[in-house]
Amino acid sequence: MEHLAPEQTTARPPAAAYRNLAVATVGFALTFWAWALIAPLGSDFGDRLNLSSFNQSFLVAVPVIVGSLGRVPVGALTDRYGAKVMFPLISALTIIPVLLAIPARNSFVAMLGVGFLLGLGGTTFAIGIPLVNSWFPPAHRGFALGIFGMGMGGVALSGYLTPRMAKHGENLPFIVVAIALAAYALLALVLITDRPDRPIPTSPLATRLGQAGRLRVTWELSGLYAIGFGGIVAFGVYLPTYLKTWYELDPTDAGTKAAGFAVVTVIFRPIGGWLSDRIHPATVTACALAVVALFAILQAFDPKLNPMGTVNFLLMAAGLGTASGSVFALVSQVTPQPQVGSVTGIVGAIGGLGGFVPPLVMGAIYSAKDSYSIGFMLLSDLALAGCVYAYGRMRNIGAQRP
């Protein structure tokens, strides 16, 4: 086994580290629920607004691209102002589009605008990573980042709870999420604390982003994260539509199964971080992506949902979750502390963009071919390429500091 560089310390994190980790994870989950509010209702919006497969895919994908790109400036702003400012601020601002969805739901154009603004909820990832990274020493960092990554469970919350709440009133999911975000913003304002000795960059935002962008490892990690986390996001926003269209499930059943997929990714993300504290994270990433490649190609042959299709999706979820955790363990290992927020923003943005494209591709492929097989073949090819690159290149830079 390949072990990590000896720089890692076994010093026990302070109690404040665990408090910040817990509060940040809750915030990540709630804002991700808001970010993913449209996806579980995508088929309902498609029927209500008479949308084509492509337009329905575009509607659920808009928050993904905005949230992804927004991580770049939000990550850099977190480097400068800290999570104590940014977490309450972003949580409070996300309430606005959540409530705007209520009057906008009968217009495709208005819902596109709401989706654009909901993207704000997807940026908190770039706030939490530098916060957790600063509080935990290297020997505990991979697992801690994996625990924070469990906030992706907000997608599962959305998939499971949103359609069920909507049965009791179309406005109910949006009202509940808005109240939860308001309560969390107040909680974060009181409980989140930035590490007193954290380095605060003084250079302009554009300069810091430029410095992060010039690091080769930024783009290498971005590519790997686009496959791992991008796959999670893509399935999170499109799996309900796929299950409804191909396997003819009703929206509630489709949302429940999509939530199960998301739960598995959430469980395996800290496992990926934990393994990366013990084995080189590039090796963990390569193995996880190999699993994704194998079961994506099996799903391309359109097996019955029970049991083979379900097994394929759950094992892909395990691989994607593990890869997401291990890639960010590698980010924290090779990135200088003052640049973690900026690099995280870029890597998170590219990862999120990796989740924007597949729903559009899947919708376009289905419209043209009445089949999703080509889409799963493409996923298998990308995962295999990431596996080879992670094992062949990224293992050699684990102990470097740019």
Region spans (language model):
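Juxtamembrane intracellular "pre-TM" segments in multi-pass secondary transporters
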Residues: 4-15, 195-222
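Extracytoplasmic gate region of multi-pass secondary transporters
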Residues: 38-39, 217-270
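Cytoplasmic helix-loop-helix junction between adjacent transmembrane helices
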Residues: 114-151
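Glycine-rich segments within core transmembrane alpha-helices of 12-TM secondary carriers
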Residues: 141-162, 348-358
